[in-house]
Design a protein with these regions (language model features):
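Conserved beta-strand-loop-alpha-helix hinge in the C-terminal portion
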Residues: 124-150
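Helical segment within the ABC ATPase nucleotide-binding domain
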Residues: 83-96
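Helix N-cap at the start of a conserved alpha-helix in ABC-type nucleotide-binding domains
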Residues: 79-81
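ABC ATPase C-loop
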Residues: 60-61
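H-loop/switch region of ABC-family ATPase nucleotide-binding domains
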Residues: 104-105
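ABC-family P-loop ATPase nucleotide-binding domains
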Residues: 1-46, 52-55
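Catalytic Walker B motif of ABC-type/P-loop ATPase nucleotide-binding domains
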Residues: 68-71
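Conserved catalytic motifs of ABC-family nucleotide-binding domains
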Residues: 64
Length: 163
């Protein structure tokens, strides 16, 4: 976390983390609500997938990025942990007023999160929707739009099962 926090700053040969910084990191980790504040000396590889994703999200936002890129950041998580990570994502994006680009195959998440939805197929944008029209979309509507725009039926079970 200290490296992420100091991103873009000059580094010297001083002590790694001052106690003031350690307290700051402890407070940030406590806000995540995943018990990470008690595992500050644990190796990241020993954390659960959800804990790692939340920690990565926190580290990515320590220095306000111009663009927060989230590429399938909940794909390997169980539904409860995925919801927690998505809630943390929303909170951080809104609180820090970040611009975020979230790539997902979960159509429900694509509809519910963000202010714009862009659907792609074979590297091409086939559907772009925002505002009230996006808010009124359903997964079934999105599947129909995909079939119309791509000229074929939807063939990925993973996306269908995420309803």
């Amino acid at each position: 976390m200290a490296l992420a926090f100091r991103r873009g700053h000059r580094r010297g040969l001083g002590w790694g983390i001052r106690s003031q910084e350690k307290d700051y990191y402890h407070d940030l980790l406590t806000r995540l609500g995943l018990g990470l504040q008690n595992r500050m000396t644990s190796k990241v590889g020993l954390l659960s997938g959800g804990q790692r994703q939340a920690l990565t999200l926190l580290m990515a936002t320590l220095q306000k990025p111009k663009l927060l890129l989230l590429d399938e950041h909940t794909a390997a998580l169980d539904p409860q942990t995925a919801k927690k990570v998505l809630d943390l994502t929303r909170e951080m994006v809104e609180e820090q007023k970040l611009t975020a680009l979230m790539v997902t195959h979960n159509m429900r998440d694509a509809i519910q999160i963000g202010n714009r939805l862009i659907m792609m197929n074979d590297g091409q944008i086939i559907y772009d929707v925002a505002g009230e029209e996006k808010q009124n979309l359903t997964v079934e509507d999105l599947l129909e739009k995909f079939a119309q725009a791509s000229g074929g039926a939807f063939a990925n079970d993973r996306m269908l099962l995420s309803k």
